[in-house]
Amino acid sequence: MTKIIDGKAVAKKVNAQTATAVAELAAQGIQPGIAVIIVGDDAASQIYVRNKNRKATKLGMHSVVRQLPATTSQDELLAIIAAYNADDSIHGILVQSPLPAQINEPLITMAIDPKKDVDGFHPTNVGKLITNFPGNYPVANTPRGIMTMLADYGVDPAGKTAVVIGRSTIVGKPMAALLTNANATVTIAHSKTADLKAVARTADILVVATGIAHLITGADIKPGATVIDVGMDRDENGKLVGDVDFDSAQGIAGLITPVPGGVGPMTIATLMQTTVELAKWSDVSE
């Protein structure tokens, strides 16, 4: 029988821990602060940013949303980031994707102070993750949230075969690094992988992050595998679905995340957790 991983329930636990940490910092006169910069009026981004802001405020954090027009130049955006880098009340900076064509996204990522890189995308922090560098640094929130879910459900990656389908810098690559650091044997699969579904069937832990609705069906899943569906897609009827065909996976997967209600809540909860950690770490380093 397939057990459903309740991302909302795990996120609730993380948020409770974060609220406690915020209160502890408040007793020291520190309020964790996050600045989210959004360029343009992408509808999905607006909803996501609104959810982030609401959650941060609810947890007692200082939250700033900087809305910029789609015509914003790269230099203007860089100047705003520089100001937040220098602002001691801001501990985490996030520039929401997608960005307009006139803005070089890698350059923007590089401009954020690595100590305020709440998304964990700065090459300095990515390098630390890849090398399993000791110490405190931010890690991409969706993969980190997935690792938290696995731990909460008693899934230890050590010695297991893990397959990550998708090689983005947001999910796929950092996910593979975290699983490797946790002693799993990891394969990264993608659109150019020969016989992708045969590779998927080898996985004890299968993470699917492609943006292709129902790419993976029950026939592609190893019996008893843990399946993490990162997809947020729309089917032909406009219904929100994942990269995994949830219905056909029933009775085959041992554990599976639903869409919605699986990975999504964990991403925002982990973002808040990371912001508070950045505030703690900055206080120690000052």
Swiss-Prot record:
Catalysed reaction(s)? (6R)-5,10-methylene-5,6,7,8-tetrahydrofolate + NADP(+) = (6R)-5,10-methenyltetrahydrofolate + NADPH; (6R)-5,10-methenyltetrahydrofolate + H2O = (6R)-10-formyltetrahydrofolate + H(+)
Listed binding positions for NADP(+) are: 166-168, 191
Q: Does the keyword Chloroplast apply?
A: no
Keyword terms of this UniProt record: Amino-acid biosynthesis, Histidine biosynthesis, Hydrolase, Methionine biosynthesis, Multifunctional enzyme, NADP, One-carbon metabolism, Oxidoreductase, Purine biosynthesis
Q: Which GO terms describe its biological process?
A: L-histidine biosynthetic process; methionine biosynthetic process; purine nucleotide biosynthetic process; tetrahydrofolate interconversion
GO cellular component terms, semicolon-separated: cytosol
Q: Which InterPro entries match?
A: Aminoacid_DH-like_N_sf (IPR046346), NAD(P)-bd_dom_sf (IPR036291), THF_DH/CycHdrlase (IPR000672), THF_DH/CycHdrlase_cat_dom (IPR020630), THF_DH/CycHdrlase_CS (IPR020867), THF_DH/CycHdrlase_NAD-bd_dom (IPR020631)
One GO molecular function term of this record is: methylenetetrahydrofolate dehydrogenase (NADP+) activity
Q: Which EC number(s) does the record attach to this protein?
A: 1.5.1.5, 3.5.4.9
Describe which pathway this protein belongs to, using the record's wording.
One-carbon metabolism; tetrahydrofolate interconversion
User: Function of this protein?
Assistant: Catalyzes the oxidation of 5,10-methylenetetrahydrofolate to 5,10-methenyltetrahydrofolate and then the hydrolysis of 5,10-methenyltetrahydrofolate to 10-formyltetrahydrofolate.
**PANTHER family tied to this protein:** C-1-TETRAHYDROFOLATE SYNTHASE, CYTOPLASMIC, C-1-TETRAHYDROFOLATE SYNTHASE, CYTOPLASMIC-RELATED
Q: How does it assemble?
A: Homodimer.
Which family does the entry's similarity section mention?
Belongs to the tetrahydrofolate dehydrogenase/cyclohydrolase family.
> What protein name applies here?
Bifunctional protein FolD
Organism of provenance: Lactiplantibacillus plantarum (strain ATCC BAA-793 / NCIMB 8826 / WCFS1)
What gene does the UniProt entry assign to this protein?
Answer: folD
